[in-house]
Amino acid sequence: MHRGRFATLVIVALAVTMTAPAGALAPQPPAQHADADRACSFPVTEPDASNTAITLDSEPERVVTLNPSAAQTMWELGDRDAVVGVSQFGTYLPTASQRTVVSGGQPSQTNVEAVVGLDPDLVLAPNTVRNTTVTRLRSAGITVFQFRAATSIDGVVEKTATIGRLTGNCAAAAATTAEMRDRVAAIADAVPDTDSARPRVYYHLGDGYTAGPNTFIGAAIEAAGGHNIAADVNTTSSYPQLSEEVIVSQDPDVVVTGVSADRLDATASALVAPSSVVRNTTAYATGNVVAVNTNHINQPAPRIVEPMARMANAFHNTTINTTLDAQPSATTTATSTAPPTDAADGTAPGFGVAAAVCALAGAALVARR
């Protein structure tokens, strides 16, 4: 169905809704779960990060995802066939390489002409896509929903539910978010709730970069029963670069690093470069280097609960199931390292969150979201 026959864009003034602080999931009223079980209804209107109310008159049949987390969510909801375009780092999902790749380069840039050529009914865009890109797409008559940055696990759950509502997958989204909440609750029950029992954790992105406490990655570390050492550093950046001196002085008990799926069982010496300051920490000396799937830890999408469970098991010797049902088999593509940058045009909508840092596996974190 052509977008012009069903999608309208209503621009209104909206108050910016701030995301909840980083942390585990907040309790939800029972009524919300009951509503989530209902079938989707159209038209549907949702406010996005650009202070725009997006209205879809009927269920979109052609969807483009400009970041891999949105693609992962569509796959998780069982609606991969509706996706006609993906970002360059979304091709790890099974059959995703058969879609048109609509971004490229380092840092990743959206090919507006390619997106328009796909004639999508809906484009799902991250907060880090350039505002000028969103404007160009909307000027071409494309319906674009731009997400706020998820800074908590609750934010990731809500993003999943929002994608479900926008794409007509409410029942699947309800099942997925319920499983996410169940997994987070199981982790909370399994790990100690006292600060003294929390190991000090450094999330190693490479070159000193790490995830701050006001990010969904920082929230995942805390929910897994760890204490993020970045919370003890005086910085306002969401993804600060710590000096070697700071990392050594913080002396983490555990180092967490994102790797490709085939390296999850690698040894500490294989995970940490010989020249890395991480080798001067207690974590490395004791072999407490925890590998997690980089596509899952770095993307605010349903699979975030898998590295959370893996971290909890490593931090506290628990035995929590580390996989969701119907896990997609992933392929891994090597990419070159990109330096960290801010939001593409310096004005991430609504919140101004830092947009990109380099991942240890070699891809820009912003593009991998």
Swiss-Prot record:
Record PROSITE patterns: FE_B12_PBP
Biased composition, class Low complexity, residue ranges: 328-343
Segments forming domain Fe/B12 periplasmic-binding: 62-319
InterPro entries: ABC_Transporter_SBP (IPR050902), ABC_transptr_periplasmic_BD (IPR002491), Peripla_PGF_1 (IPR026469), Vit_B12_bind_prot (IPR054828)
Region (Disordered): 322-343
Keywords associated with the record: Signal, Transport
Gene3D superfamilies in the cross-refs: Nitrogenase molybdenum iron protein domain
Signal peptide: 1-24
Keyword Transport assigned: yes
Role according to the record: Required for corrinoid utilization. Probably part of the ABC transporter complex BtuCDF involved in cobalamin (vitamin B12) import. Probably binds cobalamin and delivers it to the surface of BtuC.
Protein name per Swiss-Prot or TrEMBL: Cobalamin-binding protein
